[in-house]
Amino acid sequence: MSTSKRVVVIATVALSACASQLVSTGKAPTFGTAVSADEVARWDISIPPSGAGLPGGSGTARQGAQVYEQKCLACHGAKGAGKPADPLAGGAGTLASRTPLRTVGSYWPYATTLFDYTRRSMPITNPLSLTDDEVYAVSAYVLYINGIIGEDAPMNAQTLPQVKMPNRDGFISDWPPRSRN
């Protein structure tokens, strides 16, 4: 039997099992557990380009270098050069080339995206483990190694949204999302 036929057979059996439960019990199968409002609030931490919702705290690149060395260096390499993970720095002037290097400094349009992504996803082995001060500091460090801010520039809820990223005008804005009618 071909792979595609096997997939169809397996899907049919699985759907039949779900349908038989619905017929026999009168209820659809349930998966997982309901999420509480508190659980949703802990994960509802998105930060838009405006910086709305950024938490208190602050950090500089000088402070961020220490956080980076302890929690980022193993994956992102010295000064954000990459290996084994993607590089965070470099790539200036490469976006129009045949081999663009898309880094925080060359590609990302908003500094708030750096904070948002770092807070929710890094370090990859322990996401959501950095304090807000650590996220501000490591964000400042990544901006610094890309030549975007000075080493002692404080990053916080007021200053981070004001950072003008080199590729800010390289995108067609869809924020806030437009109607798709």
Predicted regions and their residues:
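N-terminal Sec signal peptide cleavage junction
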Residues: C18-S20
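Sequence context surrounding c-type heme c attachment/ligation sites in exported
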Residues: R62-Q70, A81-G82, W108-A111, S129-D132, ...
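Gly/Gly-Pro-rich "capping" loops immediately C-terminal to redox-active cysteine motifs
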Residues: A65, A81-R119, P123
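Sequence/structural segment immediately N-terminal to covalent heme-attachment motifs in c-type
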Residues: D44, G56-A85, A89
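Bacterial N-terminal signal peptides that target proteins for export
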Residues: M1-V9
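Electrostatic cytochrome c docking/interface patches
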Residues: T30-V67, P123-P127
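Flexible coil segments in periplasmic/lumen-exposed cytochrome c-class electron-transfer proteins
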Residues: T125, L130-N181
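Sec-exported extracytoplasmic/periplasmic mature domains
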Residues: P48, E69, L73, G77, ...
